[in-house]
């Protein structure tokens, strides 16, 4: 089917805590898809998504959603039921990758190095140290570093935020060994890893503001690493992508502890940010692929039974 006759529904927005990020990704992808010659309909997702899609009658769905409902297998399941080819990973891979504990079980079975962890409730994590400090507390099913808390060495007690009135990230958490070192990320497109980017920030860690605020972080591509570490990170990202059963584009994040020469995988994002300056498009551009071409690749890669 020619591009100018292929109807593409770009879905974005939704109601998760990552809605602002999704709006940015989706609108940028829609603009790129139009520039590439596709017939594009933009859909700001509501709980009536099935009706929204039925009205749009797309040939392909380009998924620009982030966070719960959009990247945890829920929307993917709806698209499978409706028989609409869609981008990125399928139901099972999306659900596994979104659950930090389940994805780490997959990593372990694949032979990847992961940080020690423990599943805890919010009440348990608030009552006493879940692990010996330093450690990190993460919601099991959130993205964009929402709800991530670092407990430093010497901390007198667990994070006070867990008992505060503004906590909205659920009652099931993962306490994880804190891995010092350099923040690395690797994008995978289909069956190939693209490059290794090092992320530096003046903040305590790569949090929401570091990820999305102007000047919040600096991306070094390619990362200045020993060749063996670069190769190991790219191999590990591709292995994680395959072990989870992912399709399309993913981005895996790592910590590299130079003192111990230890490369630890943190997570795999099945719906990575998709603005022209996001990490995956940056790596694609580094490899000679424009943002427009990247979006077109995702559209042409779309399918059901992913």
From Swiss-Prot:
GO terms for cellular component: cytoplasm. Mg(2+) 1 binds at residues 253, 267. ATP binds at residues 131-185. This is D-alanine--D-alanine ligase. Cell wall formation. The gene is ddl. Pathway: Cell wall biogenesis; peptidoglycan biosynthesis. Mg(2+) 2 binds at residues 267, 269. Belongs to the D-alanine--D-alanine ligase family. PROSITE patterns: ATP_GRASP (PS50975), DALA_DALA_LIGASE_1 (PS00843), DALA_DALA_LIGASE_2 (PS00844).
């Amino acid at each position: 089917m020619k591009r100018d006759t292929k109807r593409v529904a770009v879905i974005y927005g939704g109601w998760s805590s990552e809605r602002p990020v999704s709006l940015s990704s989706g609108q940028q992808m829609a603009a790129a898809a139009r520039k590439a010659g596709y017939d594009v309909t933009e859909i700001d997702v509501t709980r009536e998504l099935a009706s929204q899609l039925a009205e749009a009658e797309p040939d392909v769905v380009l998924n620009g959603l982030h966070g719960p409902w959009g990247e945890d297998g829920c929307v993917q399941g709806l698209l499978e039921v409706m028989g609409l080819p869609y981008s990125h990973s399928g139901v099972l891979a999306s659900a596994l990758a979104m659950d930090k504990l389940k994805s780490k079980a997959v990593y372990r079975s694949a032979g990847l190095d992961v940080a020690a962890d423990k599943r805890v409730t919010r009440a348990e994590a608030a009552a006493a140290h879940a692990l010996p400090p330093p450690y990190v507390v993460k919601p099991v099913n959130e993205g964009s570093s929402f709800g991530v808390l670092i407990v430093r060495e010497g901390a007198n007690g667990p994070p006070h935020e867990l008992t505060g009135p503004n906590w909205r990230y659920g009652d099931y958490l993962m306490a994880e060994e804190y891995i010092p070192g350099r923040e690395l990320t690797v994008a995978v497109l289909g069956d190939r890893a693209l490059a290794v980017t090092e992320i530096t920030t003046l903040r305590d860690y790569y949090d929401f503001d570091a990820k999305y605020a102007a000047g919040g972080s600096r991306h070094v591509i390619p990362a200045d690493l020993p060749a063996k570490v670069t190769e190991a990170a790219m191999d590990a990202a591709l292995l994680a992508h395959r072990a989870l059963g992912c399709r399309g584009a993913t981005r895996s994040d790592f910590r590299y502890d130079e003192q111990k020469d230890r490369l630890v995988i943190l997570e795999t994002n099945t719906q990575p940010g998709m603005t022209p300056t996001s990490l995956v498009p940056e790596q694609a551009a580094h490899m000679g692929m424009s943002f427009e071409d990247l979006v077109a690749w995702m559209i042409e890669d779309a399918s059901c039974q992913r």
